[in-house]
A protein has these predicted regions:
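Short alpha-helical DNA-recognition segment
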Residues: 20-41
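The DNA-recognition helices of helix-turn-helix-type DNA-binding domains
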Residues: 35, 46, 72-75
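Residues within the helices of the helix-turn-helix
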Residues: 15, 26, 30, 55
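Short, basic-rich loop-to-helix N-cap that marks the start of a DNA-contacting helix
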Residues: 46-59
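Short, charged recognition helix plus adjacent turn
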Residues: 1, 59, 69-81
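Short linear motifs centered on Gly/Pro in flexible linkers and helix caps
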Residues: 34-37, 51, 63
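A short, Lys/Arg-rich alpha-helix, primarily the initiator
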Residues: 1-23
Length: 81
């Protein structure tokens, strides 16, 4: 797994939050300090999250990158070492 995959999973999680009504594009934009149109484009895949934006949204939502790693992926990584 690479950072692009983790970023893809983070964006998918944010899309799910918006679809379920637990967050709004505007609210996510405020958390990261970007405009709502910019956040919209990030969620639609037209723009990518910068590292700073990803860090901010993770911190504000009390998430960690490990929240986006499946247990089986961790076990596979341990086996390869």
């Amino acid at each position: 797994m690479d950072f692009r995959e983790l970023r893809r999973r983070l964006v998918a999680h944010l899309r799910m939050l918006v679809r379920s009504g637990d967050a709004t594009e505007r609210g996510l934009a405020r958390l990261t300090g970007v405009s709502q149109p910019h956040m919209h484009n990030v969620l639609k895949g037209k723009r990518v999250f910068s590292l700073d934006m990803a860090d901010q949204v993770l911190a504000q939502l009390h998430l960690d990158l490990l929240d986006f790693v499946e247990p089986g992926e961790m076990m596979e990584r341990q086996r390869r070492r």
